[in-house]
Amino acid sequence: MRKVLSVFTALLLAGLSACGGGGGGSSPSPYTGLTTPAVITSSNADDIARQSFQGGDLGANALLSPARYGDVRPGGERPLTLTLVRLLSGAAAGVLPASSPRAAEPQAIVPIDNTEFDGMGGSVRYMLSVNDQTGAFTGRIVFTNFHGDGGGVINGSVPVSGVVDSTDYIEIRFNFQSVRVVDGTTDVTAKGTVDLTAGTGGGQATLNLYFTDNGTGKTVWLSNYTVAVTDLAGATDVRTFGRIYLHDYGYVDVWTEAPFIYPTLSTQPSSGAITLTGSNNCRARLTVVDAATYTVELDADGTGSYEWSVTHSW
């Protein structure tokens, strides 16, 4: 299960063109951007695609502003949601007991206070109260410059609750109040919840999470965004569903048309397709051509026919 916990991935890639809709709105803090369906044109589709792919990397706007359609991109950075969930997955694995048997008789709540080090100067401290009979637990996990196996560094104190069913299954909720995540040029504060469930060979994470860019103050909101993962021989099958709000553009709804396949140790998928729906039912379909390129098809008027396409390098 620890392998499953380490490979939860969020992949969002889109390109949309000339979709109707847009406007402003308000929503509960900390999201301060547009809350209506995205208005996408050929002048901003690149930006929306990269922001969606990063799942919260608002620095993508500055990175890609000079780019035009058909340009060769620099190598794609790891999606922020992938980085975050891998960080949390590593922490969740530390909650698992060393052996599955529970006490034969009901026991008192057992306190746990344990610190693990990541070998790179960081640590994660578990301060939990565990029911030794039911496996239910509550408490707090404190990250101090903690490095995940998928990259990134996390800092902050996170209330948690959940159930450990055995050494092979765990349900855990992370309740972010103000946690900082840094990965490469990305520096954000996360607030919201991540519900992580994993068992032998697969599992899923559901994110209701806000990212605030610590440089620009702009925000991204992942709403009921679900990542489902299945381990395969030499690869991982990843499927994503949900809604993402981008600060400057509004939201798109995401669903997986064909699962994204990530070869072991790769940060780029080798195949897969995802569809995004914007205003007035306009759609974009992204299909992975290979580990180096992907194609975006566009249905700008929502008729179900894709009348425009472009191919990019990651």
Named regions from a protein language model:
Residues 20-24:
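Bacterial signal peptide processing site
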Residues 1-8:
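Bacterial N-terminal signal peptides that target proteins for export
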Residues 14-18:
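C-terminal motif of bacterial Sec signal peptides marking the signal peptidase cleavage site
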Residues 26-314:
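Low-complexity, intrinsically disordered segments exposed to solvent
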